[in-house]
């Protein structure tokens, strides 16, 4: 299989990224989403769950891409956003090839913690294969 096909077929699991950046905004969680319907829905789902289960206020910023959101996460401008394992691996960590899905998540999780002090939380439980 080609790299491109592997990328398209790889279950791009959506994960939460969470930092401790909300220290300055003690009662508000700031969520960022990418400019896609799927991301908008995930952001709203996160908002509802956080408000329901914590009582914290939630603000959503819609429409940024990984190249904007990731640096903002590092600066503490956002607290959480849904991201795809393939994007985190290839775009953020700038790796040349994908790992098998069963090892990608664990390796990605460790590298983000070491390099950025960001935590990947558990998968949502579905994947985005870009297939019909």
Write out the residue ranges for each language-model feature.
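Short, hydrophobic alpha-helical packing/hinge segments within bilobed ligand-binding/sensory domains
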Residues: 68-70
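Bacterial N-terminal signal peptides that target proteins for export
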Residues: 2-9
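Short, well-ordered beta-strand elements
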Residues: 26-38, 56-62
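Short, polar/charged alpha-helical segment
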Residues: 37-56
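C-terminal motif of bacterial Sec signal peptides marking the signal peptidase cleavage site
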Residues: 18-21
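Contiguous mixed-secondary-structure segments that line small-molecule binding/active-site clefts
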Residues: 86-132
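Solvent-exposed, acidic/flexible segments
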Residues: 36-40, 62, 66, 81-82, ...
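Alpha-to-beta junction loops
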Residues: 74-83
């Amino acid at each position: 299989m080609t790299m491109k096909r592997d990328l398209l077929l790889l279950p791009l699991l959506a994960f939460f990224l969470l930092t401790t950046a909300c220290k300055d905004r003690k009662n508000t969680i700031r969520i960022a989403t990418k400019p896609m319907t799927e991301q908008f829905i995930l952001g709203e789902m996160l908002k509802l769950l956080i408000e329901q289960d914590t009582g914290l206020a939630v603000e959503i910023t819609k429409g940024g891409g990984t190249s904007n959101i990731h640096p903002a996460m590092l600066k503490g401008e956002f607290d959480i956003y849904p991201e795809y394992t393939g994007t985190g691996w290839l775009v953020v960590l700038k790796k040349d090839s994908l790992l098998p899905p069963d090892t990608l998540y664990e390796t990605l999780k460790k590298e983000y913690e070491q390099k950025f002090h960001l935590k990947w939380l558990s998968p949502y439980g579905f994947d985005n294969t870009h297939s019909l």
